[in-house]
Design a protein with these regions (language model features):
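Phosphate/dinucleotide-binding and metal-coordinating scaffold of catalytic cores
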Residues: 1-275
Length: 275
């Protein structure tokens, strides 16, 4: 419905990370992760592995390779090295921009709040540039300085949110049927899409998206109900003929009227690994 509900509290000390459900939540809703969390208000310690010291359901909200690259860029510009960060720092950075229904507050002061309309071609080309630079050891001091335009696009990519995987991608919002212009924030009636860009440094180069599209066609034939998808024409300078776009299954476009505020809803998402 888009209504925000307090699920509980995450806390960290020298012993590790702990979670406690809010009593009001348990009286109304089910367990977020029934295999690893108990449906009680007792404090529950997270295992050290395999989810960076947090419970699996929250580990699902952490960024993967591409999201980590973007976060690390931002933190380095603030003088913070990746080895100084904890999973809790990264969850605070994700805030309400991750996949699924969970959000985290307070939000990190370093988290991007850019609300911008941006050309999809520009976003994809700059994402490709950032990804390719990471392949040539971007951590070298000589590679950390970005020009103003690339800096703006980096902020837009980060503002778009966090998602799994190592490939360059962006979470964007756009009206149904309009792919040429997109934005990093939702407007009423927008659809949420995940756009997967390409790079010469990927295993299948600029054909990664085309290959995945074939797999999606196969899953449709097999009646596996894949998410809605489309191929979007890529600019010639990208080296790709098309980029793959996947409609986010966790984002409910239908809106509920919450007093004076209308809000899109989210579906809870939990991976098999996180379980």
């Amino acid at each position: 419905s888009g209504e925000q509900i307090s699920v509980g509290v995450l806390a960290q000390n020298r012993q590790g990370v702990f979670f406690q459900y809010a009593d009001d939540y348990l009286q109304q809703f089910g367990n977020l992760s029934p295999f690893t969390l108990q449906s009680s208000i007792q404090v529950q310690a997270a295992p050290k592995q395999p989810h960076q010291g947090v419970h699996g359901v929250f580990g699902d909200c952490l960024p993967d390779g591409w999201g980590m690259l973007l976060q690390d860029r931002i933190f380095r510009q603030k003088g913070i090295l990746p080895n100084q960060l904890t999973a809790m720092d990264r969850l605070a950075f994700v805030g309400d921009k991750g996949m699924g229904a969970l959000s985290f507050s307070p939000v990190s002061e370093f988290s991007a709040t850019t609300h911008a309309d941006i050309d999809l071609a520009t976003l994809g080309l700059e994402a490709q540039t950032l990804f390719d630079s990471s392949m040539s050891d971007y951590m070298d001091d000589n590679h950390d300085e970005l020009d103003g335009h690339t800096q703006q696009v980096l902020a837009a990519l980060v503002a778009g949110g966090s998602s799994g995987g190592a490939r360059p991608k962006a979470q964007i919002y756009m009206p149904a049927g309009e792919t040429q212009h997109c934005r990093t924030f939702a407007q009423p009636g927008d659809e949420a899409w995940l756009i997967k860009f390409t790079s010469k440094n990927l295993a299948l180069g600029h054909e990664e998206g085309l290959c995945e599209a074939v797999y999606l066609q196969m899953t449709e034939v097999a009646k596996c109900q894949p998410p809605q998808w489309q191929l979007i024409e890529a600019p010639p300078t990208s080296g790709a003929s098309a980029w793959l776009a996947l409609k986010r299954f966790d984002y409910v476009t239908e809106q509920a009227d919450l007093g004076s505020k209308r809000s899109a809803g989210r579906l809870h998402m939990h991976s098999a690994c996180g379980l």
